[in-house]
């Protein structure tokens, strides 16, 4: 019986590496792929950060694939990523909203490119290291939370279509993170099994989105400078550093002392004001 070919999305981290190990043990033929999405050299953080967009991670993914015995390709999609994910990310902040770039990436970039690459490389399926499962009901597929609820990633995948799900494998869906680390250790990857996890946005490995906006938006400081904090009656409470520096629900880091906790409940780009209230919602 001919082996099914799987396009394995490799990040160089423990999850995609263990996912690849499991698929190989199940008899699949793997083709690895890592997409170069963003060049952090422009932000001066390549040397100090090891985010999934770094050159280090690209070559770590290739090294893991080679050690496990399957071919691996690095594909450059930086322009597409910038035009879609980064443009949306910047645009949402400038409209006073907080973006979720992972959802945008999964729906418009990642799965689309994976399916496209899988077709080009004659792969039957694609696989990732997400902690998620796929269920079946009434002839349709649906996303299920991963067995490890603390690592469940279905929220970022809610936009996947029936076609996407029909071609997707989630080898880690039934496992906990502890079990994944143990598998890596048992396969001789002790260092990988102890590797920490990144919680940052992949193209902002230092988690400083404010500096990122200032670097990416022309004349940012002049266009999005200081404005006013106001209360629900319109009374001025103090000055802020520019509305894109704040998010709905934010309480800490406002830079003003009001004698009681205050939350950002609305952001108005049109007049550069941030509305504050004593609870996260005026209905509370």
List the predicted regions and their residue ranges.
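Conserved small/polar residues in nucleotide/adenosyl-binding loops
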Residues: 277-284
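Short, charged/polar, Gly/Pro-enriched secondary-structure boundary elements
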Residues: 151-152, 209-214, 283
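A generic structural motif
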Residues: 272-276
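ATP-dependent adenylation/nucleotidyltransferase module used to activate substrates
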Residues: 1-158, 169, 177-180, 185, ...
């Amino acid at each position: 019986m001919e082996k099914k070919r799987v396009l394995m999305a490799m990040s160089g981290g423990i999850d995609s590496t263990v996912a690849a190990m499991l698929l190989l043990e199940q008899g699949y033929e793997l083709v690895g792929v890592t997409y170069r999405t963003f060049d952090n050299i422009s932000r001066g953080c390549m040397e100090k950060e090891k985010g999934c967009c770094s050159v280090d991670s690209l070559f770590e993914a290739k090294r893991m694939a080679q050690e496990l015995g399957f071919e691996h390709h690095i594909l450059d999609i930086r322009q597409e990523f910038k035009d879609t994910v980064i443009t949306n990310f910047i645009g949402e902040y400038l409209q006073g909203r907080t973006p979720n770039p992972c959802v945008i990436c999964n729906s418009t970039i990642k799965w689309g490119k994976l399916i496209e690459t899988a077709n080009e490389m004659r792969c039957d399926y694609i696989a990732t290291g997400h902690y998620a499962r796929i269920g079946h009901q009434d002839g349709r597929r649906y996303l299920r939370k991963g067995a490890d609820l603390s690592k469940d990633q279905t929220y970022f995948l809610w936009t996947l279509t029936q076609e996407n799900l029909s071609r997707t494998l989630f080898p880690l869906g039934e496992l906990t993170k502890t079990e994944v680390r143990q598998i890596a250790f048992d396969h001789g990857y002790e260092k990988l099994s102890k590797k920490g996890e990144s919680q940052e946005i992949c193209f902002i490995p230092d988690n400083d989105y404010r500096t990122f906006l200032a670097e990416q938006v022309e004349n940012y400081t002049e266009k999005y400078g200081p404005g006013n904090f106001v209360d629900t009656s319109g009374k001025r409470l103090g000055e802020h550093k520019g509305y894109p520096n704040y998010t709905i629900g934010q309480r800490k880091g406002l830079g003003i002392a009001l004698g009681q906790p205050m939350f950002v409940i609305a952001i108005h780009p049109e007049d550069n004001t941030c509305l504050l209230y004593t609870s996260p919602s005026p209905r509370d």
